[in-house]
Amino acid sequence: FKALQIGSVWRADRPQRGRYRQFTQCDIDILGEPSNLAEIELITATTTTIGRLGFKNFEIRINERRILKAMAAYSGFEEKDYDSIFITLDKMDKIGLEGVAAELGEEGYAKESIDKYLELFELLKDRKDVAEGVAFLKDKLGDFLDQEVADSLTEIATAVNATKNAEFTLVFDPTLVRGMSYY
């Protein structure tokens, strides 16, 4: 099932400064496709549209939630805490590495786990290429990161880069976190 829609959306929470309760959003949804084709098609449709609007040299950031889970497990966090940890991680672009460390510490997580977790992000900050970042993590995390998961994200990046028809860079961003609860 594929759907494309443009329409009004309303925020359930109290809008922060610079945000509106109601805004217009474009949605592309694909349901029922078990392979990576849906991901590839969504990224391609998005980049094609942005390119046709005249934008050049833009960046598309991608991540894989299962990689985040592997990073958290490797660092010693319990699975029941992942959602809370990821909500804090999602603030990285606003509060920085130190802010994330402080907030995780305030939430009562072990300093050793926090340090080990955030060290991964520090080591990844200059590895923007998807294949390079994923390969680094696979090597570092070992069995915590399933080879199939690593191959899946690399396959998506390879296909998107091979078929791109706009001027953009596909970037691996392990701080990119959005779950269904966000929406």
Locate predicted features.
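Short, conserved secondary-structure transition motifs
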Residues: I62-S75, D90-G96
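N-terminal entry module detector
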Residues: T47, E59-I60, A72-D81
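Positively charged, Gly/Ser-enriched RNA/tRNA-binding surfaces
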Residues: F1-K56, V100-Y183
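Acidic, His- and aromatic-enriched active-site or binding-groove loops in soluble protein domains
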Residues: F77-A102
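Short, well-ordered strand-loop elements centered on a beta-strand within folded domains, enriched
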Residues: R21-T24, E59, D81-S84
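Acidic carboxylate-rich catalytic motifs and surrounding loops in phosphoryl-/glycosyl-chemistry enzymes
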Residues: I60-E64, D173-P174
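A general alpha-helix detector
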Residues: A45, I67-M71, S84, G99
